[in-house]
Amino acid sequence: LAAIRDIWGGGGEFSYGRVVLTAYAAARLPVDDALADDADGLVAAMLAAGLDRDAMRWAGVVDDGSVGWAMLALADPDGSAMVSDGELDGFVDDDDSPRQHKSRMLLAGLAGLGRVADAEIAEYGERLGIDLAAQTRWTRMIERAAEVDNPALVTMLAGLGMQGSGWDRMTARHLFHIVSALRRVGLEAEARMIAAEAVARA
């Protein structure tokens, strides 16, 4: 763990590549409540490499309402349970990211994966100042590609929708449509990982 921390906190500007670099080392660590302070980072590292099953082992260690909890709520490959109003409320209340961007990404990801009720989408969309239903030419194109079950076109349009100088430029609306479309064409694993990464990097 000390070596992992050294990589995360190395000199120079922080790079998400450092998180990716530690993915397999993080996956080899035993699940331990004593590592709770590092659990969010360890979960982010594992999910950066798509190691969702390894990351899910830490579900009992991450704090409720933490970033680690949010990433696992999105990444869970067996996720059939809906995220409740209370769980969302706790996360939003504690979110100190700029413009509550992590909360926006969480809501968009959960909505795209069908893991939050319509009532919560409406309530928290208003609370966070986002409208996932608003349409643009791009949203109509990716929705249509999903309707006709064209995973190649959905993937291409998802890539276009993710263009930008950083994850701070990713909008909740774009993430929602990307995740939803990927899930609808059978690329749910990719949808889950993108949603989790969006929260990690927001």
Regions found by a protein language model. Name each.
Residues 1-202:
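Alpha-helical solenoid repeat scaffolds
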